[in-house]
Regions:
Chain A
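Residues forming the flavin
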Residues: 1-523, 527-570, 579-582, 587, ...
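C-terminal functional segments of enzyme domains
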Residues: 360-366, 674-704
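Acidic/histidine-rich
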Residues: 588-589, 616
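Thiamine diphosphate
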Residues: 610-619
Length: 704, 416
């Protein structure tokens, strides 16, 4: 295959490079004439490309600007053009007219030609998708999720492990205000929501039911349940995990007086209030004073490190209804920070108007039972003094919120039965920009199981998760990936005859897309796959490839890198993450920051797809050094495939042997974290690396 | 996805910040026809001006990059920048919307080569950097601008009588005669994602904003710390360029105050914690004071707060700043109370950052949009029009995206 080649001389490219000479060199090597145009993205240039791309059997190669820009100007039918970045990454950051600049451009074109020749058109695998959405959990979030899905025409199966729907919301006596003027307590609305769900013909409700196992993939999850009606089996398209929360185990808080008769939790108070009987458990008397201890278990690394978010508003609400039911009782509310964000501040102000509710900042360190069931409460760091003792007839512990996560779905995945959880225990997304980015495709957590939130947040979250569930069924049914490679129709292909059953791919897949048979041969669940290529990077025998992205192709690109003429000149390969590091390179170009001309940048879908055989390919050919640029790893990982840099790093640890065999220094290979905002640092990083390589001297394999 | 209500399938999203952008993409990727209208010449809104996000301290550009890639490949989504909704007629299910397209003066032949910039003789106040620097009248709105195309500020440009940019542009991309035009769209639903603006700090007279150059707002601080900002990320005193090593933050500058914004803006505590890390990263020997009423770091954000509390270089002081003075030497002197210690004290600082709150963007809504608002101007859903993100209440980026994603379903499903 001979990809047609076009070169643009605009935007400074023509001034920096001798394009005619480049064109001739390419024609000699690839037997395809290069067409040069001063404005390739203009109407004339476009028409010129269009005329040839229609009949081409492979992508056309465009030596012009970055693939990140002007994408809408070039025809993409059926192949997206192969874009060789001669502008941002050559013309804008190299010395005009220099031999090494010309060599860099020539290499990039050769690499682009090689890549284009090894790009097949991915053919999407369409599947018939089951549209039913399974909602697990019948509390506020689950009920709203079911209603939202049904409203847009998706059948729902709603599972609840308890006998009745409604979850913990059913136990609430009143709600904190959700609408303007944000002053008055609201009647609970959960009964109405339950009635709507029960009356909806598109929603099948299964109460007293739990999941025994979940197998399969988006569009075809096979779920087995067990419950009062016996075992059931059904197929669903997507799953919403809305199992909600549990109060923190209050028995772990003896310091705060739990165990004493008149120390109760917020939830117990709610039930007492619902019955109109706020009485001391010890003697059934009306308490003359009630003290609330906020952050009971929350914001305490020994218990729950997180803030449970809802306890401040809940306690304010409870203070107010105690005021209604027991007008003579004094209410004390000891908080560390009063957290009533947004218009919740109005409600806080409303409660402050009450003369018998005393709100004080402080931290309760101990609650002890004294005479007659009364309680002595030690408060430190308050405005009342460094350390004070207060007495109350009843104490309410505003216990924190724990996600009801864990082994709920019983996934039959090679990587374990539960949704991966963050360090905090919540099966939440780690991404601020993408709260529904999940590691189990087609399964979305929503509501308080995902993160602490109030009921308004739960309703919003339910809708968001349902939209993502519908989206996953829609896109995956078309054979296309969901976030972050939305629309990608490629998928990994396994040449299983050569598989050694080493299990690295099945272990490392960040999304649990690969299962194994008894022998350890990988089995792809294509609808779970997110196309990151981590499996391709993991495979030691190179049997995993995508139609348009594979080790063979990357290896062909590496082989197109020329060797420098002078000892002083270097050849450095930079394998970079295409989402963060690659744009950072472009930004360095935009700022016209000078780079070492010996660099050759190769974008990767993710560093997780970096296969170490490429290292051997590069170093044994005489490349002086290889630098990998990927996203931050660790707790605050940035990688959108979670573990890309981490895996690449681990793989590099294991290449010592390769380097030793080649008798090369370990320093010739490096991995650095580069974020998209690091455009200003790129030049410095590469210069430092180049300086180190110059000290080591040229790769002894150069010219062999 | 079937709509819960009869009517036209199309969806109009007003506002191309993180909420509107997310709403548009999520809707389009679920197979809906979407029109996104943005007033500015670029997408991304306020987050495009942020240096980092809390609590991961990652760059907002990362998410924008992904979103812009999603946008570029989606045929179901049509974007109008420099566009304003002029008129809305009809009702839920059948709106006819007139959109005014303001001239960019740069057409789609622009390659973003930047040759026009040195030719332009006019400097203009750079509103994106809150006036802390200037650009030429022709400028690229950001390093990851979408669309990646230059634009001309008509208020600064001298027009055809200058025309030097037209002469140097080799691509015929500049058209100083470009006129505004209108397009008419027919949609079934409208999503309101009009976002926020910072509260005007000059209205808080005790905090002396505008009187001393070393008093900045939190949004200005984001730009000062940004690599691509007016100072290239150097944190220096605007007055004399000395390193800003003693930095104090005034929380609730306007928020939680019935004379200003009665509500809590929800994000300023976390923004200041994040900005404290900018200072300490730049100058490890720096000291930071944060004056607060309550520190509000809900959910997992609390863990970020705990990490900073453990840093002895950051002092959290519960109390208000009473007065700001300038010392004879030029240093700012903050007079504040420490409620827990029960004393007043004075603190010399290099930079005082006002954690100003968020105000719902008071864009005059076009005739025809009737949407109820709460006393603060936050929108409440009404038939066919669903507000998301900051149009609805103060919230952080993550909550905006959550709300935008769900809001799409609410709008299509027919609630409201």
């Amino acid at each position: 295959m001979k990809p047609p080649l076009f070169l643009c001389s605009g935007c400074g490219i023509g001034e920096t490079l001798d394009l005619a000479a480049l064109g001739e060199a390419m024609e000699r090597e690839f037997a395809t004439p290069a067409k040069i145009h001063p404005f390739l993205c203009g109407p004339e240039g476009r028409a010129m490309i269009e005329a040839e791309s229609a009949s081409a059997e492979c992508p056309v190669v465009l030596g012009a600007c970055s693939p990140r820009v002007n994408a809408d100007r070039f025809p993409a039918n059926p192949f997206a053009p192969e874009r060789v970045n001669l502008r941002e990454q050559v013309a804008w950051c190299q010395e005009p007219g220099a031999a090494e600049t010309q060599a860099q451009a020539a290499d990039y074109l050769r690499m682009g030609m090689a890549r284009a020749a090894k790009r097949e058109l991915p053919v999407p695998v369409e599947t018939a998708m089951e549209r039913t959405i399974l909602v697990v959990g019948g509390g506020v979030t689950g009920l709203n999720a079911a209603l939202e899905a049904a409203r847009v025409g998706y059948p729902v199966i709603l599972l609840e492990k308890e006998e009745r729907l409604g979850g913990l919301a059913r136990r609430m006596h009143r709600l904190a205000p959700r609408v303007a003027p944000y002053r008055d307590l609201e009647e609970p609305s959960i009964a109405k929501t339950v009635a709507l769900v029960e009356a909806n013909p598109s929603i099948r409700v299964l109460t007293s039911t739990q999941i025994e196992s979940t197998a399969g993939e988006p569009g075809a999850f096979q779920v087995r349940t067990t419950g009062v009606g016996g075992n059931q089996e059904f197929t669903v398209g997507a799953i919403i995990l809305a199992t909600g929360w549990q109060p923190y185990d209050v028995t772990r808080l003896p310091k705060l007086g739990y165990g004493a008769a008149n120390v109760i939790t917020s939830l117990t108070l709610e039930e007492m209030a619902a019955q109109g009987r706020i009485l001391r458990p010890s003697d059934g008397a009306k308490p003359r004073s009630v003290l609330f201890v906020l952050c009971a278990g929350s914001r305490d690394p020994e218990h729950l490190a997180h803030c449970s978010t809802v306890c401040c508003a809940t306690s304010l609400k409870q203070g107010l209804y105690i005021r209604e039911q027991l007008p003579d009782a004094a209410v004390y509310l000891i908080y560390r920070d009063m957290r009533t964000p947004a218009q919740g501040e109005d409600f806080y102000r409303r409660v402050q108007e009450e003369e018998t509710i005393f709100l004080t900042r402080g931290q309760v360190t101990a609650v002890r039972e004294i005479d007659d069931g009364d309680l002595s409460v030690t408060v430190v760091s308050s405005l009342l003094g460094e350390k004070v003792e207060l007495t109350a007839q009843m104490v309410v512990l505003a216990t924190g919120l724990v996600p009801a996560a864990g082994d709920v779905l019983h996934l039959k995945y090679r990587q374990g039965p539960q949704m991966p959880e963050l360090k905090s225990g919540f099966p939440d997304s780690n991404y601020l920009c993408f709260p529904y980015e999940t590691r189990r495709t087609g399964i979305y957590a929503a509501g308080t199981v995902r993160q602490p939130m109030d009921s308004v947040g739960c309703v919003e979250d339910a809708a968001g998760a349902v939209l993502k569930a519908i989206q996953s069924v829609t896109l995956i049914g078309q054979g296309r990936a969901v976030h972050p490679r939305v629309g990608d129709a490629s998928f990994p292909r396994f040449f299983l005859q050569n598989c050694t059953q080493c299990k690295r791919c099945t272990e490392e897949c960040p999304f649990g897309a690969l299962d194994e048979d008894e022998k350890g041969t990988p089995k792809l669940n294509v609808n779970r796959c997110r196309r990151c290529g981590t499996c391709m990077g993991a495979c030691p025998v190179r049997i995993i490839s995508f139609a348009d992205y594979n080790v063979d192709q990357l290896s062909a690109m590496v082989k197109k890198v020329s060797m420098p003429q002078k000892d002083d000149d270097l050849r450095i390969l930079a394998f970079v993450c295409e989402n963060d590091a690659y744009p950072a390179w472009d930004m360095a170009g935009l700022r016209r920051l000078r780079q070492d001309p010996g660099i050759r940048v190769i974008p990767l879908r993710c560093l997780g797809s970096f296969n170490v055989v490429l290292l051997a390919d590069a170093l044994s050919r005489g490349i002086d050094g290889v630098i990998l640029m990927g996203c931050q790893s660790g707790d605050d990982y940035q990688c959108h495939f979670m573990v890309g840099s981490e895996l690449a790093n681990r793989r590099l640890e294991n290449v010592k042997e390769t380097l030793e065999r080649l008798m090369l220094e370990r320093e010739r290979v490096e991995l650095v974290n580069v974020g998209i905002g690091d455009g200003g640092r790129i030049a410095e990083i590469t210069q430092q690396f180049a300086a180190k390589l110059r000290q080591l001297g040229p790769n002894p394999y150069r010219g062999l | 996805m079937a709509s819960g209500l009869p009517g036209l399938p199309g969806l109009l999203v007003i506002g191309g910040g993180i909420s509107g952008l997310s709403a548009s993409l999520e809707a389009a990727e679920t197979g809906n026809e979407v029109y996104l209208v943005e007033r500015e010449p670029y997408l991304g809104g306020r987050v495009a001006g942020m240096n980092r996000y809390f609590p991961k301290l990652c760059s907002p550009q990362c998410g924008l990059e992904i979103n812009f890639r999603r946008l570029r490949q989606n045929k179901a989504l049509r974007v109008f920048t420099l566009a304003e909704v002029e008129k809305v007629e009809g009702q839920a299910g059948d709106f006819t919307v007139t959109v005014r397209l303001n001239p960019r003066y740069v057409n789609d032949r622009c390659t973003a080569c930047g040759e026009c910039v040195p030719a332009c003789p006019v400097e203009r106040r750079n509103a994106r950097n809150y006036g802390m620097d200037t650009t030429r009248a022709v400028y690229l709105p950001g390093e990851v601008a979408e669309p990646f195309r230059y634009t001309i500020d008509p208020l600064a440009c001298e027009g055809a009588k200058c025309g030097r940019c037209v002469e140097v542009c080799r691509y015929g991309a500049i058209d100083l005669e470009m006129a505004s035009s209108t397009v008419t769209l027919r949609v079934g639903r409208i999503v309101l994602a009009t976002g926020w603006r910072p509260y005007d700090p000059a209205l808080i007279s005790t905090l002396e904003f505008g009187h001393f150059p070393d008093i900045v707002t939190n949004v200005m601080m984001e730009r000062l710390a940004a690599d691509g900002g007016p100072t290239g990320g150097e944190l220096r005193r605007p007055s004399d360029g000395q390193p800003a090593k003693r930095v104090a933050f005034v929380q609730c500058a306007g928020s939680r105050d019935q004379n200003h914004l009665a509500y809590c803006s929800g994000v300023c505590c976390l923004a200041s914690l994040k900005q404290a890390t900018y200072v300490l990263e730049r100058y490890p020997d720096a000291s930071v004071h944060i004056f607060f009423i309550d520190i509000r770091t809900p959910g997992g954000f609390e863990i970020f707060y705990q990490r900073l509390q453990a840093d002895p270089r950051i002092k959290f002081v519960k109390g208000k700043v009473a007065r700001v003075l300038q010392e004879p030497g030029g240093d700012l002197m903050v007079e504040a109370e420490d409620l827990l210690a029960g004393r007043m004290f004075r603190l010399p600082v290099d930079l005082l950052v006002l954690a100003t709150g968020m105000v719902p963007e008071a864009m005059p809504l076009p005739p025809g949009i009737k949407i109820p608002r709460d006393p603060y101007g936050f929108a409440v859903p009404s038939p066919g029009i669903w507000p998301v993100g900051l149009a609805k209440r103060p919230m952080d980026v993550q909550s905006c995206v959550r709300d935008a994603t769900g809001g799409i379903l609410k709008a299509i499903g027919g609630e409201g």
